[in-house]
Amino acid sequence: MENNSFIFTDGKDPKMIEAYKKAQETFKYFWRELSWEYRRIVPGLNIACVKASFSEIDSDGDKIVEHMWMNDISFDGDTVSGYLINEPNDLTTIQPGDYFEIPLNEISDWLFAITPMQKKAKGFSKLFSSSAEPIPKAYGGFTIQKMRADMSESERRDHDEAWQLDFGDYNEIEVVNEQSEKPENLIEHPMSRNMKEDFVKFLEEYPNELTNIDEEGFTLLHRETIAGNLSSVEVLLEAGADKHLKTNKGKSAFDYAKQLNWEHLIPAFEKN
């Protein structure tokens, strides 16, 4: 990511406010992807970050606001946490590397990018295939896409070249990998489907994982629910995970399923 890329955004622009809301509503897909990224031996994401606003009052009593990116993101169902990436332009009380916790309803954007899998050329088509690495495809980036929509075609090309990302069509913002080719990925992450049998075996070998509770009151069922992983949630419930257990904030896994609007999880809780 280019340092300080599009830090400032117009908080009074209705379309920018709409972009903020879209980012907040769809953040769950970002977190779902990141929940699997943290389990991968070989990283699959080129970039994964969240944008939020940061402010302070200057010596004249005026409020200074900058929108900047954080990475190393964590999420507990309510709060997004991470470390500041950008160097502020005007803010003086924060710096890159500072840790922040931001309520989900206060983030302004999220972005992740994945390098598309290259299909191997066969036969005659090999003569016309390129050996160049494909450009990582961006997902999310609602405020970025709003700004791209306001640019001329040449400005968009320069912008995308600076980021070295394929942002696609600003009118069709995708939130999950291969969304156009595999719309079923909106319902469940492919790794969740593919790992179901392995997860069953894992719980058979480590049954204590069903009942382990961390210092904040979260169980594995809470975590998998927040990430929207249907197969994992089904396996946990069928194995006897207690869906009534509440975190220190007083929320059950089912509460998080409803709060984050993971519609595909709700029948699993009602059934078990």
PLM features: what roles do these ranges have?
Residues 189-195, 223-229, 256-262:
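Ankyrin repeat A-helix N-terminal signature
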Residues 167-206:
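Intrinsically disordered, low-complexity regulatory segments in ankyrin-centric signaling systems
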Residues 180-189, 211-220, 246-252:
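Ankyrin-repeat boundary/"N-cap" motif
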Residues 37-62:
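Short coil-to-beta transition motif at edge beta-strands of beta-rich domains
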Residues 201-209, 234-242, 270-272:
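Ankyrin repeat domain, specifically the short helix-to-loop turn at the C-terminus of the second helix
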Residues 80-102:
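Short solvent-exposed strand/turn elements
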Residues 243-272:
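Leucine-rich solenoid repeat scaffolds
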